[in-house]
Amino acid sequence: MNVLNEKSLTVRGKDRYKSGVMSYKKMGYWEPDYTPKDTDIICLFRVTPQDGVDPIEAAAAVAGESSTATWTVVWTDRLTAAEKYRAKCYRVDPVPGAEGQYFAYIAYDLDLFESGSISNLTASVIGNVFGFKPLKALRLEDMRLPVAYVKTFKGPPTGIVVERERLDKFGRPLLGATVKPKLGLSGRNYGRVVYEALKGGLDFTKDDENINSQPFMHWRERFLYCMEAVNRAQAATGEVKGSYLNVTAATMEDMYERAEFAKELGSVVVMIDLVIGYTAIQSMSNWARKNDMILHLHRAGHSTYTRQRNHGVSFRVISKWMRLAGVDHIHAGTVVGKLEGDPLTTRGYYDICREEHNPMQLEHGIFFDQNWASLNKMMPVASGGIHAGQMHQLIQHLGEDVVLQFGGGTIGHPMGIQAGAIANRVALEAMILARNEGRDYVSEGPDILAKAAASCTPLKQALEVWKDVTFNYQSTDAPDYVTTPAVA
C-alpha cells in the first residue's frame, strides 16, 4: 500500500491524445492499483524532487522518461501497445529519516528490454532520466530481475565451485595481494614481488586498476615476469597459484591480444576494470568462458556513482548487473578496511554475489526477493587497508567464500614481502583452525593471533606494526531502515 495514497489519474480515450503537454501521472505512468507481473523488471528509485514538485508526479516522470514518454503528447503512441509498454510507478513511500526523499517502485514490462544485454538495460533505467530537471537527485537503489530475464544471461564463466576445484583449495578464504607501488616498478622487480608473495603463502597476486602498459613497464614484459614468478612459486610450494593480469586496454582488439598472451603463458586468471564498460565486460566474459579462464573485475570508478546516498546507482545494483554480465571475482568491500563499507550494506553485496536466492532483507539494503536461476556465483574480493590483525573480523563479516587481498598488509611488512605473506597465511590458518574446533574465534581473535605469533616471527611483527590501525569512519551509504553500529 502506498504511503502517498493518490488514486490513478490516467486520462484515457480520445482526451489522452490531444496535442499539448500532459502531466506524467495523467499519461499513465502512475498506476497505484497495478500489481507487478512475475516477468516484470522492478526498479526502486530514491527520488528527490525539486522544491514544489509533487513527489508522485516526479516518480511518474521517472517511470515515463525511463520507458516510453517524451515531454509532450505524441500521436504515434496510438501505433503501439502503449498500455503494455509504459513503465508503471505503483508505489511511492517517504524515505525514513530523509525529508524530501521518496522511494518509488516502478515496474517495466519485460518486452522493453533486449535479451542478455546490460548495455540495453542500463540505457533505459539509468539513461536520460538522471538529468531530468524536476529532480534534485535520483538514485537507483535496487532491482528485481525476473527469472525469465536472468536466464537470458550466461553469468560468471567459472563460478566459485569450479574455481576452488581448479585451485584445489577448500574450507578457507583465498589470500591475495595487490602489487605495490601500483605504478613505477620495472617488469623484473614487479615479478620479484609476485614471487615472494606467492612463495610466502598467498594464493594470488594482482595488478592494480591503473597498471596497463606504460613507459616504465610494457604489458608483455609484466606478463612474462609475472608468469615466471607464478610458475616458480608453484614449483616451490606445490600449490596452484595465480596472478591477476590486467588486460584492460584502449580497444577490444588490444584486450583480446593481451588475454590470449596470458593464456599462452599458462595463466589461470585475467583481470579487467569496470571502467571498460558493460559491453566490453560481457565480451571478455564470453572470451573467458570459451578459454576456461577465471575473470577478475576491479570495480575501478564505481564510487563516482555509488558513493553518494541520494544520487547515482547503488553498488548492490552494480553487483547484480555484474553477476548477469558474467565476472568471477568482484571487489565488494571490506567493512574494516580503508574504503567505504557499512557492515550490513556490505553483507548485502556479498549475499548478491554468493547466494542462489536473495530474500528481501531491508536491514541489508535488499528490497526484493531475487532468484538467480542457477547462475554461477561470484567470488567477492575484500581489498583496501586490511591486515593480519583483523583476520577474525574479516572472517566474521565476510565469511569463507571471499578473496582477502592484503596489498600494503603484505608488501609493507618490516621483514619483507615473503614475511608479510607468511604472516597473513599463518593468521588465516590459525583462525580457521579455531573456528573448526568450535571456538568463539571472534571474541578470542586477538588471543588466537597472539598465540600463533609466539611461534611465527613474521606474524608477531605484523601485529606489532599494525596493531593500532583502524579506519573507523561513519559510512555514507547505510540501510535506511536500520541504524548500523560502527565497526571497532
Swiss-Prot record:
Q: Which residues form a coiled coil?
A: none
Q: Does the keyword Amino-acid biosynthesis apply?
A: no
Q: Where is the active site?
A: 180, 298
Organism this protein belongs to: Nitrobacter hamburgensis (strain DSM 10229 / NCIMB 13809 / X14)
Q: Kindly state the subunit structure of this protein.
A: Heterohexadecamer of 8 large chains and 8 small chains.
Question: Looking at the record's lineage, which domain of life comes first?
Answer: Bacteria
Where along the sequence does the record put site: Transition state stabilizer? 338
**Residues given in the record as substrate binding sites:** 128, 178, 182, 299, 331, 383
Q: What's the protein here called?
A: Ribulose bisphosphate carboxylase large chain 1
